[in-house]
């Protein structure tokens, strides 16, 4: 059972473990699937991110958040990070709150190896658009209360999606993920646990530098 977005806690090889800050870089070292992020509200250092990108597969979580000021600076930082990801063929993990059209236009303007929008809560049409751009969305249990999820139940799955807890790794994280996957399996009549693992590992295998870093 693989968790496609968690945060550093107890050791596990069954989660993509992400940070919101470059200050947490030392906490990532035990985890085989790890991603260094830099979100609004935290310190940013492009040299740290670039050095990470040279030796690792994932960058993120990164993105924009309207709850913080300095919109122009947020998008400037995001573009700089995406330039690094494009250069080094990294898969990017996105955080998104607000400014949706500008965010998507920025993401789609780069030739990324791959990207995942975590805790997805945008529209069904945007979900399809992300799929057409070879991206993936990841759903946490919070997604069940969104309009997108209601539409997904009505219209069905067009592109595969991932599941996550967005919590620290540990016993509770495992329980949350199992409950969420079981619920989705019942709703969509598929083995969600297997579907997520197959989708995630097939997707990251397309990264040209995976296994060489």
Regions found by a protein language model. Give the residues of each.
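Mid-domain alpha/beta scaffold segments of enzyme catalytic cores
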Residues: 1-213
């Amino acid at each position: 059972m693989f968790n496609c977005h968690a945060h550093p806690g107890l050791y596990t090889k069954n989660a993509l473990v992400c940070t919101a800050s470059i200050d947490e870089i030392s906490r990532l070292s035990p985890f085989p699937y790890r991603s260094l992020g830099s979100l609004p509200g935290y310190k940013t250092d492009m040299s740290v991110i670039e050095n990470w990108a040279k030796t690792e597969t994932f960058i993120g979580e990164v993105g924009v958040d309207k709850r913080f000021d300095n919109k122009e600076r947020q998008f400037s930082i995001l573009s700089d990070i995406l330039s690094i990801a494009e250069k080094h063929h990294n898969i990017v993990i996105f955080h998104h709150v607000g400014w949706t059209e500008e965010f998507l236009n920025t993401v789609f303007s780069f030739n990324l190896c791959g990207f995942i929008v975590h805790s997805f809560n945008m529209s069904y049409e945007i979900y399809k658009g992300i799929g057409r751009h070879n991206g993936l969305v990841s759903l946490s249990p919070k997604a069940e209360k969104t309009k997108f999820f209601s539409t997904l139940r009505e219209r069905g799955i067009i592109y595969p999606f991932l599941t996550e807890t967005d919590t620290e790794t540990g016993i509770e994280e495992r329980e949350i993920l199992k409950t969420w996957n079981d619920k989705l399996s019942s709703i969509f009549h598929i083995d969600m646990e297997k579907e997520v693992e197959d989708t995630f590992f097939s997707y990251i295998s397309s990264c040209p530098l995976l296994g060489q870093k």
